Amino acid sequence: MRYGEICMQKFFIGEVIRKRRIELGLKQYELCEGICEPVTMSRLETGKQTPSYNKLKTILQRLGLPDDQCYMLLSKNEMLISDLQTEITSCNVLKDPERGLPKIEELEKIVEPDDTLTRQFILRSKASLGKKENGQIVPYTLNEKLDILFEAIRLTAPNFDIDAIYEGLYSIDEVKVINHIATVYSDLKQHKKAIDIYYQLLKYIRKHFQNILQSGGLLPLVAFNYARELDLTGRYTEAVEIAETGWKACVQYGQYYYLPSTIALIAECYHFLNQDEKSKTYYRQALYLFDAIDNKRGAKIIKSEIQKYFGTDFLV
C-alpha cells in the first residue's frame, strides 16, 4: 500500500508520521530539527497537538510523504503570510524587485520570531531580489548571496554540510535554497563545487520525493542546472544523459518550464560532440517550443547559438 493511499484512509496524521519516521530509522529530534521542539513532535504523533500548516507540510516533505491530502483551517495571519509568499514567489520568478521588496517588508512585519520556515523564505527571496541602497535597488554580491543562503538553510538545518547533503532531511523549500547556493557557486566559476552539489541534490530528490506531487518541478530544475554545469566544463556526454533525465521529468510531472532550455542544451552538447545533424534536430525542437510559448528571449538566445555554430547552414 502506498503512502498516498494510507493518508486517504482513516488514520490520523500523527500515526502516519510516526509509522514513516520509525520506518526510516529517525528519532523525533532528527525529524523536527529547525522546525519545532521534540515535545511538540511527540504531541503531534500522539494526536494531542497540531502544528501550523507550514510546519506540518515541511515534516511530511522531509519524510517523503505527500502533503496534498492534508487540509487545515488557517488563521488570518497564516492566510496573510501565504498570500504574501505567493506574491513574492511570483516576483522572484519574474525578477521584479520593485514589487517584491515592499512585499518582503510587509512579510517581515508580521512573521513571528520563531517562524524559521517563513524567515528562511524571506532570506531566500532577498538573495534573489536584492536590496535598497540610497533609494536604489541593487543586487547582493555573490559572496553576500552565499552568506544569506547559508544563513537561510541553517535556520532549519543547523548542522547542514554542503559536502554531505545526503546526511540531512529536507523539504521542497530547503532543496530550493540548496539549489540556489549551487547557482551562486556556478556564478563564482566554482563549477566543480556546483556539480557536486547538483549531483547530491539529484540523488536526494530521486530517493526522497517519489511520493510528493508538488516536488515535480524540482527534478527538471536541478537536472537542467546540473547538465548546464557539465556542459560548461566540457563533459558533454554526461550533460546529455542528465538533461534527458530532466526532459523525462518535465513530461512525467507536466512541468514544462525548463523543457525548451533543456532540449537546447542537448543540442549544444551534440554540436560539441561533432554530431551536428543531431544537434540541428534538437535545436529545431527547442526553437519551436520557445516560439509556441512566446518566449522571445529564449528564442533569441537559441537563434544566436544556431548562427554561431552553423551560420547559414541551418533550415528551420
Language-model features: locations:
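Short alpha-helical DNA-recognition segment
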Residues: 23-43
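DNA major-groove recognition helix of helix-turn-helix/homeodomain DNA-binding modules
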Residues: 54-69
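Amphipathic alpha-helical segments of tetratricopeptide repeats
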Residues: 104-111, 150-163, 199-210, 244-255, ...
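A short, Lys/Arg-rich alpha-helix, primarily the initiator
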Residues: 2-23
